[in-house]
Each structure stands twice: as C-alpha cells, then as structure tokens.
C-alpha cells in the first residue's frame, strides 16, 4: 500500500490486515501507552478544513508511535494565500516529512497530492468524496463492538449525499459477504447514484425516508452538513429531520455509531445508554491510525 486515498484502492485482505494491526496497536496502548516503531520519523498534517478528532487522533497516533508532527490548521498562515498550488506545497512538504495526512475541501485533492509526493499520502477527507481512515476505524468499531462484519445489517441515517464517511463505508462493506444496508434520508440528501451503482449487486440495499431500525446490528447516524449546502435555505428545510432518542432505541440489541461532530441528530440522553458507542468509536481512531501510519511507512521503505 503506497498511499491511502480511497477505499476503492484497497481490497478485503488489506482491510483485514489493517484491522489486525489495529488490534495490536490497541493492545500496546492498553499495556504501555506508546512504542517506538516510528521513532525519529515525521508526519505532516495539512488541514485545509477544520477538524478535531481526525487531526488530533493522527497527531496522537504518531506520537504514540514515537514520531513527531509538523503541519498547519490555518491556511491563512501559509503560502496558499500567496497563490501557491497544492502540487507545489506537497512537493515541498514531502521533502520535510516521512508521511503526509491531508484534509482538503476539494474532491480529488488527496489523489493529486499523492501524485506529487515522495512519501505516503493519507486522505483525511477530500470534500464530500472519501474519508478512508474514518471508514477503517468504523470497520474496526463494528468488528470490536458487534463481533462480525460479514452478514452485518446496518442503517445509515441522515446526510447520505454529502457524508463522505458513508460513501467510503458502503464501498468497504460491499467487499464482505451477506451485508444488508438501509439508506434512510430525505430526497434532498440521498446517496449519490454513482455510489449506489458501485455497490449494487454486491450487497442488499433498500432506500427509504422513514426511520426503520428494527432488525439491524448498527445504526449509523450522520450530521446534516450545513457547510456543504450552496443554498442555506435548503439546509434549513432538512435540519433536524432525524433525531435519535432513547425511545427510538428502547431495548434493541443495536450499536449506535456516529462519525462526529454531533449537532442535534442524537439526543444527549442517548450518551448514557449501553447501545451508544460513538465515543468509543472516536477512541478507536488512535489505534487504527497508528496501524495505518506504521504499515504505510513500512511499505514505503521496502
């Protein structure tokens, strides 16, 4: 694995290898808290968009591996404001670092970065396109909290149009046998047809507007992403259309996930019920990103 740009680029066996390595990283975290696999190495985090969990978990992962971090979170302090191209930025920074993690508002920015980098590039989210490291930590959460990925029944609820985490996860799940997916969203926020076409025939799909979480293993809630709407009035038409409460969950044997941040789509009272795993899901970002960084670096020096 040279870069991690899209879930389309990696197969089932590579996914399972990353999940196995993530389990080893979690064990290290629990036993010692750190290791020296990437001692003396540098990760560059280039965040052209705001981030809390992804950026901080990448930085934590690199430091837990014994490495160091450079980067930026505010492009107003960079040469981007002078008109420097993304390609030139990557060519320069890949000379300073051993790995690069980039988040960018433009679809395809991570791919372009990988084409201009001397070191492995990790897509930390490119517009509404892909978010592969989130997908891998989602799969790890499912494996750890549900116990299986094959024959999984999962309901995605909310913004399925702009939600890059949903796009990536659906594509990854299509590699596993017996998966059934419910896509629950308003018409304005349906899953893009190209994603549907990509996974059609590989998994059982059903689309609906009304919430139906009976007979599922996982409920995957998503935020309605105001920042992706061209017309803010369209956002307010769908804002708050789905809100998960304790009453919805009841005694169901289900795992509730959310890529976070949350706005109003999950009541805060849900946080304290045993089915809620979204904060555990967020924690898993550290061992999973440790595994990704370690494996990418090892492959780059072979």
Swiss-Prot record:
Catalyzes the condensation of carbamoyl phosphate and aspartate to form carbamoyl aspartate and inorganic phosphate, the committed step in the de novo pyrimidine nucleotide biosynthesis pathway. One of its GO terms (biological process) is 'de novo' UMP biosynthetic process. It catalyses: carbamoyl phosphate + L-aspartate = N-carbamoyl-L-aspartate + phosphate + H(+). Heterooligomer of catalytic and regulatory chains. This is Aspartate carbamoyltransferase catalytic subunit. Its EC number is 2.1.3.2. L-aspartate binds at residues 82, 164, 223. It holds the Pfam family OTCace_N. Gene3D superfamilies: Aspartate/ornithine carbamoyltransferase. InterPro entries: Asp/Orn_carbamoyltranf_P-bd, Asp/Orn_carbamoylTrfase, Asp/Orn_carbamoylTrfase_sf, Asp_carbamoyltransf, Asp_carbamoyltransf_Asp/Orn-bd. It is an enzyme of class 2 (transferase). It comes from Methanococcus maripaludis (strain DSM 14266 / JCM 13030 / NBRC 101832 / S2 / LL). Pathway: Pyrimidine metabolism; UMP biosynthesis via de novo pathway; (S)-dihydroorotate from bicarbonate: step 2/3. GO terms for molecular function: amino acid binding; aspartate carbamoyltransferase activity. Belongs to the aspartate/ornithine carbamoyltransferase superfamily. ATCase family. Carbamoyl phosphate binds at residues 53-54, 103, 131, 134, 260-261. Keywords: Pyrimidine biosynthesis, Transferase.
